[in-house]
Amino acid sequence: MLSIIILAAGKGTRMHSMLPKVLQPLAGRPLLEHVINTSRLLDPDEVCIVYGFSGEKIQKQFRANTDLLWAYQKEQLGTGHAVKQATKLISPSNKVLILYGDVPLIDATTLKTLMSEHQNNEISLLTAILPSGTGYGRIIRRDNAVQAIIEESDASEIERNIKEINTGIMYCDASQLDDWLNRLNNNNAKGEYYLTDIIEMATNDGTKINGIQANKWEEVMGINDKKELANAERFMQKELAEKLMAQGVSLADPNRLDIRGKLTCGTDVFIDVNTIFEGNVVLGSNVSIGPNNIIKNTEIHDDSRVHANCHIEGAFIGKHSEIGPYARLRPGANLSDNVKVGNFVEIKKSTVDRGSKINHLSYIGDAKIGRAVNVGAGTITCNYDGVNKYTTEIKDGAFIGSGVELVAPVIVGKDATIGAGSTISKGAPENSLTLERSKQMTNEKWLRPKKDL
């Protein structure tokens, strides 16, 4: 049986932010969410979050996770004190794994290795070799066995040169852990209760300390400031890009891709540079995404293409469709197969059926467009009276000329044609030409005003 404790009580002063450190975004999700998601891959019986600073914000962020346990650390008295708050809530007969809300890159495979190599009556400790150990407790070994952890503030000059550091991640019996926590003291430079002090305590008790090194030091990086957050972002984006390419996705430049959520791709997908994917995005097979796009919570189906500089959110795009360049699809844009949406077209909360085209400079809002409809350049659905939104319906085969205003609520009939420059407010019957224009006039005696020189 497994209990997981995640420490998330720190204020994160070096972030210089009103947002708690563990809620800072990484790849579109809070730091703590990454750790919780990794925890779930280990199939724990219980997950306990230790919170403190701005705890109400943290709990609100994860209110949908009703299975989480919450332990409050009122005073920031060190990691040992924080873990003690959680051991009051977890089962004493379980094994316990301690993780950190500001160490979001930790891989589930690494944690499974840590636990699989654990023996009874010992502590399994995750360590790492860092280019620089600055900011971390150093691992003290004797005959290759871990003997102690020295916090940097208490380390000698020789000890500070040690590259193997303590990640803080450990695995042991909950009952043993609680016993050691009860024996901690705060006789150190910071006057805090260090979780790391239990290592020396356990060694003195004859308990073996099993130190397991992480494969990549980056996955145990703690995030304390915006620079470290940016470094973690680049590392995670690199990892995500490599996973996509391993699945067969073609990336024009893996270093110029941002995934801020979940991206699912079919076969033979191509993604050009500087595209941002947010939320849950699904790309079907043989989909091509041009450069400089923002795509959020959208499905794009097989053989469709998005040209450069489009903004797409909350949309559904069917097969063999073409979007952009410079198009905007807002939430509720639902496009069927073989649909063309061209440059400077905005679509909001509208359905566009198979084979229809909206090629240039148009606004389509709260509309229902049938099959094989041609919407001319500069067409506007006038859907809002200042209070209410109204629907425009354009039926199959209709042809809308350029510069047309459709004043909703209005219906354009099947195979109807609307003449260019018309303002249509009373509907248009099927199989007919409908146009509405003011009389053209020419004043041959008119003189253009001129500025005084």
Locate each region found by the language model:
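Conserved N-terminal catalytic core of the sugar/cofactor nucleotidyltransferase
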Residues: 30-109, 113
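Short catalytic helix/loop segments, enriched in acidic residues and glycine
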Residues: 18-35
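Hydrophobic targeting segments
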Residues: 2-6, 32, 46-49, 225
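Residues at the starts of beta-strands that form the adenosine-phosphate
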Residues: 3, 45-47, 95, 122, ...
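N-terminal nucleotide-binding beta1-loop-alpha1 segment
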Residues: 1-17
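Conserved alpha/beta core of the MobA/IspD/sugar-nucleotide pyrophosphorylase nucleotidyltransferase superfamily
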Residues: 165-266
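Conserved core of the sugar-phosphate nucleotidyltransferase
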Residues: 56, 66, 106-189, 196, ...
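Structural signal for interior beta-strand "rungs" in well-ordered beta-sheet cores
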Residues: 250-435, 440-441
